[in-house]
């Protein structure tokens, strides 16, 4: 359920990102080109994958999303920016086909009768989404279980993305629970650096997730184009990611699959965490499930030991290294060699990696999870503070408090 972004709702979109010679991955499954004109070629090298999900990162079978309405023919470029149009009317998310309705705070002095009346009025405004509510545009990405398409809600003209998943493929792979978990978790998260899941609906053969549109695509594409990032961009991305993960952990949610393919870029270039398919609520997170991409998995997971939110700190260290170097620290030619390097924490720094970054990465890549720093420590690390162009949420709060006093 990953990957990224000509064939538009109404004409060419100029936000497509050029591909480059990026970090190479060891292929574990044969890439088969899709013949479907609506399917976008991912263009990404594959990573070494662990056994439990190696089969989940291959292209989907050729399937075509059919809309009952033709796309509008004269949509202007500016309408493709999600920030420039109103968002669709709020709708509720429940266990059927409904979208989510943001909860509103009830006044503290409302009587039970007034509250019941208000809830009844809100209930009357709810409706179910259907494919006919959207104009479907060009494909943005593809995965084993389906594709992601640019779309526009007809009534509000709101630009968004729709992830289309095929039920038969989900059932065959036995990952229906993973999809339910993704919907349950992502739909309740509200953070500027987390991709919004507005709602979902389904028909006889497919499940549709209504997602926020990230115009600048996947971070992995940008990394391929530039080969590696400079200190300022790396520190800024790590700040945004640590801030979002701190929010997730406060909600007792751990992601467990942080990697460039699962990080998207909003219209202002801000990082957004996507794809919560492997995430879990922390109380049930002490599992020995081997999931996610091997390059980013910590020793406790590949060794089948219990784990907690510290797995995301390890992934943060791997990500920081890859941003600066252009490849993951434990990358090897075989699955077995990658496994061994992770288990022994064997990696080296190229000469051009700055000392401050080396210190942060070395602290994050500790075999013992309890020795890894907290996310607060990461945000307050001298190298991050000196190079990041964006303050963390906690820093913003401090600045706001100091101004008021």
Swiss-Prot record:
Protein kinase domain ranges (all copies): 134-384
Its EC number(s): 2.7.11.1
Covalent cross-link site, Glycyl lysine isopeptide (Lys-Gly) (interchain with G-Cter in SUMO2): 259
UniProt-listed GO biological process terms: cell division; meiotic spindle organization; mitotic centrosome separation; mitotic spindle organization; positive regulation of mitotic cell cycle; regulation of cytokinesis
Statement: the UniProt record of this protein carries the keyword Chloroplast: no
Positions of the UniProt region annotated as Activation segment: 281-294
Location of the protein in the cell: Cytoplasm, Cytoskeleton, Microtubule organizing center, Centrosome; Cytoplasm, Cytoskeleton, Spindle pole; Cytoplasm, Cytoskeleton, Microtubule organizing center, Centrosome, Centriole; Cell projection, Neuron projection
InterPro entries recorded: Aur-like, AURKA, Kinase-like_dom_sf, Prot_kinase_dom, Protein_kinase_ATP_BS, Ser/Thr_kinase_AS
Activity regulation field: Activation of CDK1, appears to be an upstream event of AURKA activation. Phosphatase inhibitor-2 (PPP1R2) and TPX2 act also as activators. Inactivated by the G2 checkpoint. Inhibited by GADD45A and p53/TP53, and through dephosphorylation by protein phosphatase type 1 (PP1). MLN8054 is also a potent and selective inhibitor. Activated during the early phase of cilia disassembly in the presence of CIMAP3. Inhibited by the small molecule inhibitor VX-680.
Principal cellular location given in the protein's record: cytoplasm
Database matches in Pfam families: Pkinase (PF00069)
Active site, UniProt feature: 257
Gene3D superfamilies: Phosphorylase Kinase, domain 1 (3.30.200.20), Transferase(Phosphotransferase) domain 1 (1.10.510.10)
Catalytic activity: L-seryl-[protein] + ATP = O-phospho-L-seryl-[protein] + ADP + H(+); L-threonyl-[protein] + ATP = O-phospho-L-threonyl-[protein] + ADP + H(+)
Biased composition (Basic and acidic residues): 111-127, 396-405
Binding site residues for ATP: 144, 163, 212-214, 261-262, 275
Modified residues (Phosphoserine): 42, 52, 343
Oligomeric and partner information: Part of a complex composed of NEDD9, AURKA and CTTN; within the complex NEDD9 acts as a scaffold protein and is required for complex formation. Identified in a complex with AUNIP and NIN. Interacts with FBXL7. Interacts with CPEB1, JTB, TACC1, TPX2, PPP2CA, as well as with the protein phosphatase type 1 (PP1) isoforms PPP1CA, PPP1CB and PPP1CC. Also interacts with its substrates ARHGEF2, BORA, KIF2A, PARD3, and p53/TP53. Interaction with BORA promotes phosphorylation of PLK1. Interacts with CIMAP3. Interacts with GADD45A, competing with its oligomerization.
Protein name, UniProt field: Aurora kinase A
């Amino acid at each position: 359920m990953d990957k990224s972004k000509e064939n538009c709702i109404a004409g060419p979109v100029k936000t497509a990102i050029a591909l480059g010679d990026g970090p190479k991955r060891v292929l574990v499954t044969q890439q088969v080109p899709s013949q479907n004109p609506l399917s976008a070629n991912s263009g990404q090298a594959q990573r070494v994958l662990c056994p439990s999900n190696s089969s989940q990162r291959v292209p989907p079978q050729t399937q075509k999303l059919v809309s009952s309405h033709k796309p509008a023919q004269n949509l202007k470029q500016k309408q493709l920016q999600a920030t420039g149009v109103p968002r669709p009317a709020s709708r509720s998310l429940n266990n059927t086909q409904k979208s989510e309705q943001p909860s509103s705070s009830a006044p503290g002095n409302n009587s039970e009768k007034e509250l019941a009346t208000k809830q009844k009025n809100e209930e009357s405004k709810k409706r179910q989404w259907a494919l006919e509510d959207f104009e479907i545009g060009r494909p943005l990405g593809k995965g084993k279980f389906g594709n992601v398409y640019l779309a526009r809600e007809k009534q509000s003209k709101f630009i968004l993305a729709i992830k289309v998943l095929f039920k038969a493929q989900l059932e065959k792979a036995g990952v229906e629970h993973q999809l339910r978990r993704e919907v349950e978790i992502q739909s309740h998260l509200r953070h500027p650096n987390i991709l919004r899941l507005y709602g979902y609906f389904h028909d006889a053969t497919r499940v549709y997730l209504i997602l926020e549109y990230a115009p600048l695509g996947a971070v992995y594409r940008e990394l391929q184009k530039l080969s590696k990032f400079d200190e300022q961009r790396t520190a800024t991305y790590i700040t945004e990611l640590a801030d979002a993960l701190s929010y997730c952990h406060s909600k007792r949610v751990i992601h467990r699959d942080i990697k460039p393919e699962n990080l998207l870029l909003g219209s202002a270039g801000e990082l957004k965490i996507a794809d919560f398919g492997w995430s879990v609520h922390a109380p049930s997170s002490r599992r020995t499930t081997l999931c996610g991409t091997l390059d980013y998995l910590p020793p406790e997971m590949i060794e089948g030991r219990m784990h907690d939110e510290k797995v995301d700190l390890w992934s943060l260290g791997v990500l920081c290294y890859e941003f600066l170097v252009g490849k993951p620290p434990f990358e090897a030619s075989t699955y077995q060699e990658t496994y061994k390097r992770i288990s022994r924490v064997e990696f080296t720094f190229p000469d051009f990696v700055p000392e401050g970054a080396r210190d942060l990465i070395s602290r994050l890549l500790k075999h013992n999870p309890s020795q890894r720093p907290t996310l607060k420590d990461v945000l307050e690390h001298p190298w991050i503070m000196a190079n990041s162009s964006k303050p963390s949420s906690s820093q913003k709060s401090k600045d706001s408090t100091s101004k008021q006093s």
